[in-house]
Amino acid sequence: RHNLSLNRSVAERADMEIILAFKAYALWKTFPIFREYISSTTASSLSEAKLAYHEFGSKAHTFSPAYTDYEIDEIAQCSSHLTFNSLTQYERYHERVRRANSDIRLGLRVNPEYSEVGTLLYNPCAPGTRFGVSADKLPQTLPSDIEGFHCHCHCESGADVFERTLAHIEEKFSPWFPQLKWINFGGGHLMTRKDYDVEHLINIIKGFHQRYPHLKIIMEPGSAFGWQTGPLVTQVVDVVEDKGIRTAIINASFTCHMPDCLEMPYMPAVRNAETLEVDDPTKAPEGAHIYRIGGNSCLSGDFMGFWKFDHELQIGENVIFEDMLHYTTVKTNTFNGITHPSIGIVHLDGKLETLRDFSYEDYRSRSEEHTSELQSPIHLVCRLLLEK
């Protein structure tokens, strides 16, 4: 609730709308709490748009790199705003979208060709990006039903980064601002991090309002809502050693349950342990009680390390990874059929409620046949191959 309160306060003081990005957090059983503080969400797929409409109770602000013939109508019906990634996608679908939802607000994603995100995997403005329209490719007069621009350039960034990025956005795209009604500055604004300068962000937005008073401002953070609110509690199931490297194997998996750790990569904080930076991951640092932590999948690279503990790890004791709520539950996979950790919530009175337990049926149902009138070409190809 602290994160929700801060996001609502920033939105009110800066006179903008802050909405939740489902790509980072989509635990719908907690939506009643969220609805006390925010009124909208952002989606990037049909499933997320339906979750917004049916579970959050409001239509989504939707963006996708590429909409499809077999989903676009239902996406439009579940969306209040729909942003196209390219002018070709706009030309292909804008009339169809309006037929499906006459009240929808349309936008274009633009590429300011500037981002300070250092990891290429997460940099939406890197050379060759598939995201957005650059200024040199925009027509001088926008299509009459385009009401807004969407820019996404950040990843767990500070207000100072947004200030510098905004200068590039204005330099490249302000000539089109008089034709717009709203602008969405995307996600990656980590307002709830301790060192985030909230006052500076508010002043930046107020200055933008003074320059462009007709534009409604939207931000759609994800991590800022779930930041430091959910640890992953695992247990040590074995300790093995090879070539001087001790590995504590846990009953969870980096590749299945914490994929961002391997993708970025980054070392998650472990409670009551010191994270050790090493130049050569094949050699253990010197000292006592130093461990790699290994996952319980068959992937050779399902490990990270090293961490230094203040004692010998014992089979059965907890290893707790901090800040594991965002970009985990939405990205878990069933590689190896590894069971997912249960999901729970601690209420204000201290009571722990289990929101979700996972079982064999969750794994099995991924390959279970479902009859549906709407089938994607992927489904049809798979069925044809099986029938042959």
Where is each model-derived feature located?
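A non-catalytic, amphipathic alpha-helix used as a structural packing/dimerization or gating element
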Residues: H2-L6, H168
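A short, Lys/Arg-enriched amphipathic alpha-helix followed by its capping loop at the start of a domain
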Residues: L6-M16
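Active-site-proximal beta-alpha core segment in soluble small-molecule metabolic enzymes
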Residues: M16-W182, Y196, I204-G207, R211
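Short, conserved beta-turn/loop elements at beta-strand boundaries and strand-helix junctions
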Residues: P112, E241-D242, P377
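Feature marks short, surface-exposed loop/turn motifs that line or immediately flank catalytic pockets
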Residues: Y114-E116, C155, M191, F225, ...
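Glycine-rich beta-strand-to-loop/alpha-helix junction loops that act as flexible
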Residues: H152-H154, I183-T192, P221-A224
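Charged (often Lys/Glu-rich) extended helix/loop segments that serve as interaction or gating elements
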Residues: I204, M219-E368, S372
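Single conserved hydrophobic/aromatic residue that forms the stacking wall/gate
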Residues: E369-K388
